[in-house]
Regions:
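Conserved ABC ATPase signature
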Residues: 151-155
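ABC-family P-loop ATPase nucleotide-binding domain
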Residues: 1-27
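Helix-to-loop junction immediately C-terminal to a conserved catalytic motif
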Residues: 67
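The feature captures the beta-strand-to-loop junction immediately N-terminal to the Walker
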Residues: 52-54
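ABC ATPase NBD coupling module
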Residues: 71, 83-99, 104, 127-134, ...
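ABC-type ATPase nucleotide-binding domains, specifically the catalytic core motifs of the NBD
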Residues: 31, 111-132, 140-142, 237, ...
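ABC ATPase C-loop
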Residues: 168-169
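Helical segment within the ABC ATPase nucleotide-binding domain
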Residues: 191-204
Length: 255
């Protein structure tokens, strides 16, 4: 693991191959307040990255900025070498293959599970495309298929999380941004959610960028870990290396 501000060469090395997602010297924030101060991030397809750090470090703001929810003052976001920095969130989802699973409960409680999945395809040209995508989800996740006609409000917290991630898959993204996937979940549902993410990364080749308050679980999952402090990347390393670092353990892992 690198100590001190990591070099771009080290960040590129940890990407795990040709970067699918490349964030370069990103400065961004909300209104007149700059939250991110020159963030670099790279990740190849089929790889995972978890950001940890203290509250207010800017972790979720990195996801917001990649997706287009912040005011970017300088730097760039590239997908497969194409500059997508100024694209709207809808354009990033439809054209560039970036999907975002929000931290807060984002399912529609009075819609059925099936209808929630259809909503994930709101940018598709034809309604039947979303319906076909929903059927593919049901084939892969029988737990949701068994609930397809029930309103989302009757789902457990873990099932809602599966639904939210599945809805993001309807547009067949290449990059999946996931904000706090374990928050508020019982341990058995945390395992279920992370099993799904592992399959999406290793089986479907998605690049997954995650913020996770359960730092130990996030680093166990991720190929790469970034530590953010005060809007900057302070440390980088493999997830395994960060887990073994005594200082990281003391500050973020309860060790």
């Amino acid at each position: 693991m690198d100590r001190g501000a990591p070099s771009r060469e080290r960040i590129a090395e940890l990407a795990g191959g040709e970067p699918l997602l490349a964030v370069s010297d990103l400065r961004a924030g909300y209104g007149k307040m700059e939250i991110l101060h020159g963030v670099d991030l790279m990740l190849a397809a089929g790889r995972s990255l978890c950001m940890i750090g203290p509250n207010g470090a800017g972790k979720s703001t990195v996801l917001h900025s990649i997706y287009g929810f912040t005011r970017i003052t300088s730097g760039s976001v590239r997908i497969g070498g194409e500059d997508v920095t100024r694209l709207s969130p809808n354009e990033k989802l439809r054209r560039s293959g970036i999907a975002y699973v929000l931290q807060d409960n984002s399912s529609f409680p009075d819609m059925t599970v099936e209808e929630n999945l259809w909503m994930g395809g709101y940018l598709l040209d034809q309604p039947w495309q979303a319906k076909e995508a929903a059927e593919r989800v049901f084939e892969k996740y029988p737990r949701l298929a068994n609930r397809r006609s029930q309103p989302a409000r009757v789902l457990s917290g873990g099932e809602r999380r599966l639904l939210e991630i599945s809805r993001a898959l309807v547009m067949e993204p290449r990059v999946l941004l996931v904000d706090e996937p374990s928050i508020g979940l019982e341990p058995r549902y945390i395992e279920m959610v992370f099993e799904m993410l592992v399959e999406l990364q290793r089986g479907a080749g998605k690049a997954i960028v995650m913020v996770e308050q359960n730092a130990k679980k996030g680093l166990q999952f991720a190929d790469v870990g970034y530590v953010l402090v005060a809007g900057s990347v302070a440390r980088v390393g493999s997830g395994a290396d960060l887990l073994q670092d005594p200082e990281i353990g003391r500050l973020y892992l309860g060790g």
